[in-house]
Structure formats: structure tokens, C-alpha cells
């Protein structure tokens, strides 16, 4: 059945812009009901690709988590490139790696641009807690698909329970 969008759907992207230094909380998924992004080969490929795009000066990944069926990132744009274009590069380069595993990306993505002065801590915490809240590991364990930039980890780690979540964080929704 074709998706039918209500009035105003096409206007959602009007007025959107991307500029150097803007921070975006991004989420993109595998097509449902696929899983497998956390397989070691695929996890390594995902990390290599976000590093490659960083080295190409498209973005700086501040923190990210790779889950079995989706991925969350907090990025800072580093080039005059639309965020959607960077995501297309990312997903496009990874498509060839996913194909032999019979995996493919969902077409769309979620993005939220952080406003100037908006506290990034809630996004860092959300990304950090994602595998714990999904029940994929216990509070005292570390998730292999989690990444935090070294500079950001210096301050964020001090707000954790020695690199793992405080029990009360897991109770927050």
C-alpha cells in the first residue's frame, strides 16, 4: 500500500538549511525488520565510513551508537554541505557493504538541528543509554557500538558512573 501523506508534508523541508558548525542529532534505520549492523564486520565498516567523511571535512562525529537495526549520531557539519547530502554519501558508500548481508537502508532519516546554545548533554545521554534501554546489556557493561570523540569523552565521562550509566539514568524516559 502506498504511503499517503497529509497536507503540508512537502512543506516540512521548506526553510531548512545547513551551515558550517551546526550540530545535528541524526537517526537512520535499516529497512524493517532487518538487523545486523552490530556484526563486527559491519560495525567496523560503519565506523570507517563516518571517519572517512570526517577526514573529507563533511562532519565531525561527536558521539554515536550503532544498534542492531539503526544508528544515532550527533555531528557537527564542517562543510557547506546539506546534512541530507552527507547522509546520502554515508548510506550510499555503506550500501555495497550491506548488500552481501542482504541488508539495506530505510529511505528516510530523522534529523534535529540543535539550536545555538542548546545543551547537547541530553543528546549525549540519549545516545549513550540507547543500548541499555533496549535491554542489550547490563548497566555495568560497555557497548562495543558506542563512540564518543576523545575531547567530548573527557567531560561526558565525568558525568557517568566511571563510563557506565547511573542506575537512575536507566529509569528516566
What are these regions (language model features)?
Residues 1-173:
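Short catalytic/metal-binding and nucleic-acid-binding patches
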Amino acid at each position: 500500500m502506498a504511503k499517503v501523506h497529509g497536507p503540508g508534508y512537502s512543506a516540512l523541508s521548506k526553510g531548512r538549511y545547513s551551515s558550517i558548525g551546526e550540530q545535528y542529532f541524526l537517526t537512520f534505520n535499516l529497512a524493517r525488520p532487518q538487523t545486523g549492523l552490530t556484526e563486527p564486520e559491519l560495525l567496523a565498516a560503519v565506523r570507517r565510513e563516518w571517519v572517512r567523511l570526517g577526514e573529507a571535512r563533511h562532519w565531525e562525529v561527536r558521539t554515536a551508537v550503532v544498534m542492531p537495526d539503526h544508528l544515532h549520531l550527533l555531528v557537527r557539519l564542517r562543510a557547506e554541505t546539506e546534512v541530507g547530502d552527507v547522509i546520502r554519501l554515508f548510506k550510499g558508500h555503506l550500501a555495497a557493504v550491506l548488500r552481501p548481508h542482504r541488508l539495506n537502508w530505510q529511505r528516510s532519516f530523522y534529523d534535529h538541528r540543535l539550536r545555538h546554545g542548546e545543551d547537547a548533554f541530553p543528546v549525549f545521554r540519549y545516545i549513550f543509554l540507547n543500548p541499555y534501554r533496549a535491554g542489550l546489556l547490563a548497566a555495568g557493561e560497555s557497548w562495543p557500538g558506542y563512540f564518543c570523540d576523545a575531547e567530548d569523552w573527557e567531560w561526558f565521562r565525568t558525568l557517568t558512573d566511571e563510563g557506565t550509566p547511573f542506575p537512575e539514568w536507566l529509569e528516566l524516559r
